[in-house]
C-alpha cells in the first residue's frame, strides 16, 4: 500500500505544481482580456488598473502596444489635462500604429476643446477621416469646420457644414445654423434665409435664427431707402 501511496502523492503534487505554473503563465493574458472588456464597457478607470498591471508582467510587444492604445484612449475620454501629450507620446513610440488616424483625431479634438483652432486643424488634417468610426467622422467634420470658421476660412468651413447638414445626426442642426450664418456673413442672403427658416422651431437656434431673418428682411429695405435718397426719389 505504501508503495502505491507514494507515487500517488508524487502525481498529485506534480499536477498542483503544473496548475500553479499554468496560472502564473496565464495571469498577464487574463489581465489584458479583463482590461479590454472593461475598455469596451467604457469603464476607463477599471480598464486602466488592469492594463497597467498587465504591462508590468507581460513581454508581448504587440499586446503591450494595444494596451498602450487603450490607456491613452482612456486618458482622452477621462479628459485628463495631459491627454494630448500622452497621445503624442503614443504616436512617437508607435508611428506605424493602426490607430494613428484615430489618435490624430483625438489630439485635434483636445486642441479644439481648448480653442486652439490652428493646432486642431493641423492634427485633424493628419488623420484620414475614412479610418474613423461613423460617429467620429461626424465629430471630426464638425470640429474641423468650426475650427476653419474660427480661423477665417469660411468657404472651406461651409463645405464641411453643408455635408454634415445632409448626412449628419448629432451635429446636423448645428451645421444648418452655421451654413446659414456663413451665407449671411458672405452676403448670400437668399440662401441664408432658407437655411435660417429651417431652424425657426429649434429650441436651441430659434432665437438666433429669428434675429438673422429679421436682419435679412431689413437689408433690402435699407438698400432701397439709401438708393432712393441718393437719386432724390425718396419722399
Describe the function of each predicted region.
Residues 18-52, 56-69, 77, 85, ...:
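N-terminal leader/linker segments that initiate helical-solenoid repeat arrays
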Residues 21-25, 55-64, 91-101, 128-138, ...:
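Short solvent-exposed coil/turn linkers within tandem alpha-helical repeat scaffolds
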Residues 224-231:
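Conserved small/polar residues in nucleotide/adenosyl-binding loops
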Amino acid at each position: 500500500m505504501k508503495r502505491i501511496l507514494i507515487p500517488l502523492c508524487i502525481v498529485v503534487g506534480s499536477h498542483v505544481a503544473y496548475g500553479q505554473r499554468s496560472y502564473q503563465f496565464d495571469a498577464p493574458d487574463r489581465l489584458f482580456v479583463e482590461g479590454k472588456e472593461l475598455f469596451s464597457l467604457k469603464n476607463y478607470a477599471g480598464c486602466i488598473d488592469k492594463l497597467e498591471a498587465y504591462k508590468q508582467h507581460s513581454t508581448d510587444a504587440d499586446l503591450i502596444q494595444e494596451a498602450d492604445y487603450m490607456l491613452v484612449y482612456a486618458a482622452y475620454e477621462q479628459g485628463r489635462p495631459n491627454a494630448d501629450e500622452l497621445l503624442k507620446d503614443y504616436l512617437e513610440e508607435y508611428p506605424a500604429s493602426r490607430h494613428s488616424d484615430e489618435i490624430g483625431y483625438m489630439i485635434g479634438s483636445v486642441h479644439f476643446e481648448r480653442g486652439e483652432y490652428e493646432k486642431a486643424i493641423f492634427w485633424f488634417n493628419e488623420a484620414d477621416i475614412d479610418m474613423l468610426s461613423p460617429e467620429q467622422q461626424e465629430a471630426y467634420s464638425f470640429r474641423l469646420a468650426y475650427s476653419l470658421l474660427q480661423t477665417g476660412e469660411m468657404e472651406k468651413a461651409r463645405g464641411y457644414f453643408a455635408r454634415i447638414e445632409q448626412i449628419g445626426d448629432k451635429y446636423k442642426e448645428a451645421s444648418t445654423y452655421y451654413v446659414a450664418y456663413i451665407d449671411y456673413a458672405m452676403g448670400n442672403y437668399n440662401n441664408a434665409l432658407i437655411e435660417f427658416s429651417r431652424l425657426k422651431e429649434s429650441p436651441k437656434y430659434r432665437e438666433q435664427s429669428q434675429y438673422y431673418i429679421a436682419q435679412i428682411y431689413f437689408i433690402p429695405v435699407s438698400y432701397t431707402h439709401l438708393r432712393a435718397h441718393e437719386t432724390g426719389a425718396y419722399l
